[in-house]
Amino acid sequence: MYRRATSGVRSASARLSSSLSRIASSETASVSAPSASSLRNQTNRSKSFSSALRSFRVCSASTRWSHGGSWGSPASLRAQARNSTPVMEKFERKYATMASEHSYKDILTSLPKPGGGEYGKYYSLPALNDPRIDKLPFSVRILLESAIRNCDNYQVTKDDVEKILDWENTSTKQVEIAFKPARVILQDFTGVPVLVDLASMRDAVKNLGSDPSKINPLVPVDLVVDHSIQVDFARSEDAAQKNLELEFKRNKERFTFLKWGSTAFQNMLVVPPGSGIVHQVNLEYLGRVVFNSKGFLYPDSVVGTDSHTTMIDGLGVAGWGVGGIEAEAAMLGQPMSMVLPGVVGFKLDGKLKEGVTATDLVLTVTQILRKHGVVGKFVEFYGEGMSELSLADRATIANMSPEYGATMGFFPVDHVTLEYLKLTGRSDETVSMIESYLRANNMFVDYNEPQQERAYTSYLQLDLGHVEPCISGPKRPHDRVPLKDMKADWHACLDNPVGFKGFAVPKEKQEEVVKFSYNGQPAEIKHGSVVIAAITSCTNTSNPSVMIGAALVAKKASDLGLKVKPWVKTSLAPGSRVVEKYLDRSGLRESLTKQGFEIVGYGCTTCIGNSGNLDPEVASAIEGTDIIPAAVLSGNRNFEGRVHPQTRANYLASPPLVVAYALAGTVDIDFEKEPIGTRSDGKSVYLRDVWPSNEEVAQVVQYSVLPSMFKSSYETITEGNPLWNELSAPSSTLYSWDPNSTYIHEPPYFKNMTANPPGPREVKDAYCLLNFGDSVTTDHISPAGNIQKTSPAAKFLMDRGVISEDFNSYGSRRGNDEVMARGTFANIRIVNKLLKGEVGPNTVHIPTGEKLSVFDAASKYKTAEQDTIILAGAEYGSGSSRDWAAKGPLLLGVKAVIAKSFERIHRSNLAGMGIIPLCFKAGEDAETLGLTGHERYTVHLPTKVSDIRPGQDVTVTTDSGKSFVCTLRFDTEVELAYYDHGGILPYVIRSLSAK
C-alpha cells in the first residue's frame, strides 16, 4: 500500500549552532525574519538581553493586507472593531519587511502586473543563481526567503542563509535557525492565559522602572473565541441560541477581559464567540498565502497556540502550533528558535475509490506517518495524486499533523489552491498576485509542467486506490481500524488487557445489558452502545464533501423510515457560518435535523471535551456499572477521558459514518453483514443502502457551495452578536486585577523579579512526584474539560462561593493560576505507577506514604522546600499545544522531567518555563534501570550556564546508589539563555526593562 525509502541526504557529526536572540536592532522590527545574535558564551547569554530591547520597539502599523475585494478583509475588520468601540485607540500598522542594511539588496526584484505596472518588490530566489534551491523542498524555501529578506549581517547573517541553502547537509546536524512568523493566531482557551501573561508582564516592566506600554504585539495577532461553547442543549431548534446564552453567562468575565485586551493592545483582532472555529476561519478567511505590504511581497506564515494550526498548511501557508509562552515571545519580537527540520517527502498516486472519504485518507496517512516516525520534521506532499485532492481534503490531512507527529503537513500551492482562494471570496486580482509571486519565486507547483526532482530526508508513497473506509480508536487517533474489521476489533478490545486497545472485560460480562427508562419508554445500553454522535471539529466541517455526504446519508435513512434512537446525544457544530448556508441551499439541513443533528453552535465542542452532560437518565444508567459506552465523532483526537468522562471508547470517523453509527446505535456492528436499521415494512436497511455515490456528493457540492457565502459570512465577522456588544470593557494600559476573581488572576511568575537573571537552579535530593508510562498527553497533564466535583480545583471554587453548576471547564479557567495549579494532573484517567496501576489523579507522598491528590502532595513538598521531578515513558506531552501543561508543573514545584521522549511542542514549553527536560539514553527507561520512583534524585548540571551545552550528557544520581546518564533536551543556545533567566518571559521582561 505504501513504500518507504531513505534518501541519500548525507550525514555528518552534529554541530549545534549557538545563536541566541538575533534581536532586531533596525529602526523597525521585521515581520517574519529570524532575529537573534550569536551567543557563543555565558557573557552573551547573560548580557545580550541588555541590547535586546531594540527589537521590541513598538511599531505603528499600517492597514492589514486586504483580500482585494470590497467585502471586509482582516484589515478593514480590525478597523471596524476599533471604530465601533469608543475606548479603542486608533493606530496604523506598518509591516517592516526589510532590514536597514541588506546583504541581498541586489536580488530585490520587481514583480510586473499583466498589462503594465507592478505588484511590488520581492527578494528573488532564482536571482541567487544557486542550483541548490531547485532541490529544496517548498516548505524549506519559505524559511530561506525569510532569512534572505531579513539578512543584514546583524539580525540574520549570510551564514544563516547558507545553512538553509545547504539544507541537504545541515538538516541532519541539528543546526539551529531563528524564525519570525508573519502573524500569530490564538483561540480563547490559550488566548486568555496569553493576555493574562501580557498584562502581568506590563506590571513587571513597570515595577522594574520601565514603560509598560512596551509590551505590545509587533505582528498581527488574531484571537478567535471558539473554545468556550459547550453542548448543554442538543436536538432542538433553539439549541445553538441557548448554548450561546449559557456560554456568555459562564464566561462573561473572560469575555470582558478579552474585550479589554482588544483595546489595550495594538495589532490585535478579537473574533467574537459564535463566529466559527479558529482553524477554519484561518483557512477560509485570515490566510493570505502571500502578503503584499505597501508594495513589498513575501510569503504568509503563522504560528498559533493550538496544535492544529497546521491546518493552514493545506493552503500552502507555513504554519504550526507553539506553546502560549512561545507565541507571546513571538508577538513581542523575540525570534523563534528552531532546529532546521528534516522533510519527509510523501508521494500520492492514483485516486480514491468509490465511497472512500478524505477522513478515511487522513486516518490512513496518520497511521503510516506515525509508524514511519516524523516527530520534529516537516512532511511535504506531492505527486500525481494531488490533483485528486480538493483543498479541503488537503486541509483535513494537514490538520492532523500533530496526530502523526509532524511539525507541518505541507501542501505547496498549485492550481487547486488558487481555485479555493477564489471560491472563498479572495478577489481575482489578489489571486493573480499570489500566483505571479509564487511562480516568479519558484514556490508554485504546476503539475502540467515537468517536475524538478526535490531532495527529501526520506520518502513515502501511497496509492490512493488502496485507501479503504476506516475509523480510529478507541483511545488514540493513529489506531486505525478498517471498517470491515471493526466488529472483530471491538471484541478484541473487550478481551485485551487494559491499554490503548483493551478494556479487560471478562467474557461472562461482555453481553451485559443495562435496561432503563427514557422519557417513559424502555431503553437499553450495552458495551459499545453509541451515546454520543457528534459532527464536529474543523478537521471535517471545513470539508463540504463529507458534510454533504453526511446530510445525504441522513436523508436516505429518513426516506427509508430510519431514525436515530432518542437517547443518543447527537450534535452538529460547524466550524464556520458558511456550512449552515450551503446546507440550507442544498435543502439537506432538514434531513440532518430529522436525525437529531441540530446545529448546537459554531465552535469547538465535543472534539475538545465540551460535549456537555449526557441526559440524566442515560448517565444514571451508565453510572455504577462496568458498561463501556462509545462516542463517535468527526474530530481529530480521542484520547481517553477527553471526549466525555462516561464514554470510555471514542472513535474518530467521517461525518457520514458518524450518522451511520448513530443510526446503528452501536460500534459493535459489521456494516457489510448487519443492518443499521429496519424499515416500517420490516425489511433490513444496510449501510450500502444509504451511502451516496461520489458523483452524487460532487453534484450537490457544486450547486450548493458559492463564493458569495464566504463573502457574506466574513464581511461582518467582528460585529459579533448582541451578547458580545453589550459587554462593557475597561479602557486602561494596565489591567486592574480583581483578587476575588476565579477566572482572571495575576500569576505569580514575575513577583519579586530582579533585574539580573537567577542562573541555573540546583536539583538535589528531589522526590518523584509522579511515575508515568508511555503516551502521557497534555490532556492528562492539564485537562481542558469538566472540573470533577471532588477535585482540589472544585474545593477551591466552592470555598469561594462557586456552585458546581458554575464550575465551567478547566479550559475556561486558564486565566486563573490557582485553579489551574490544582487542575494539573487532575485527569480522572491518569495512571501513576506509584499507585501500582490505580487509575485517577492521585499520587503517593513518599516521605509519609500517604495517598494524596497530586496537588496536595506537591503542596506538602513545596512547604517542606523539597524539590520534585517526574519520571515518564515515550511521547510525554503528546497532544494539544497546551502551555498550562508546563506552567502547571512549574507551579507544583517540578524542577525536571526525565522521559524516554518528548512531544515537540511540550518539550519546548518545558524549556520555556525553565523546567529541565531530560531524556533517558536509547534502550533505557525507568523500568530497565530499576527505578521505582521512591528514590531521591540529584541532577548534576554545571552551576554556570556558560558551562552547559545544548544536548549534552547529564548524570543523575539517586540516594539508592544508582546513577544513570541522560541527554539534556535544551536543544539550542536560546533555550539555555531562557533557562538562565528562569524562562522565556522573564528573559523578555529583563530585555525590555534594561533600557
UniProtKB/Swiss-Prot annotation:
Which pathway?
A: Carbohydrate metabolism; tricarboxylic acid cycle; isocitrate from oxaloacetate: step 2/2
One Pfam family matching this protein? Aconitase_C
Q: What happens when the gene is disrupted?
A: Reduced mitochondrial aconitase (ACO) activity by 20 percent. Increased tolerance to oxidative stress mediated by paraquat, a superoxide-generating agent. Altered acetate assimilation leading to lower levels of CO(2), CHO and SO, and higher OAs (organic acids) accumulation, especially fumarate.
Principal cellular location given in the protein's record:
mitochondrion
User: Record-annotated residues binding [4Fe-4S] cluster?
Assistant: C538, C604, C607
Question: What catalytic reaction does the record list?
Answer: citrate = D-threo-isocitrate
Q: What induces it?
A: Slight level decrease after 3 days of iron starvation.
EC numbers on record: 4.2.1.3
| Gene3D superfamilies in the cross-refs | 6.10.190.10, Aconitase, domain 3, Aconitase, domain 4
List the subcellular locations. Mitochondrion
What GO molecular-function term can you cite, just one? copper ion binding
**According to the lineage, what is the superkingdom?**
Eukaryota
What cofactor does this chain's UniProt record say it requires?
Answer: [4Fe-4S] cluster
Q: How is the cofactor bound?
A: Binds 1 [4Fe-4S] cluster per subunit.
Q: Where is the transit peptide?
A: 1-83
Annotated GO CC locations? chloroplast; cytosol; mitochondrion
Tissue specificity, in the record's words, reads: Mostly expressed in roots, leaves and flowers, also present in stems, and, at low levels, in seeds.
PANTHER family for the chain:
ACONITASE/IRON-RESPONSIVE ELEMENT FAMILY MEMBER
Q: Which NCBIfam families does the entry mention?
A: aconitase_1 (TIGR01341), PRK09277.1 (NF006757), PRK12881.1 (NF009520)
Q: What is this protein called?
A: Aconitate hydratase 2, mitochondrial
Name of the gene: ACO2
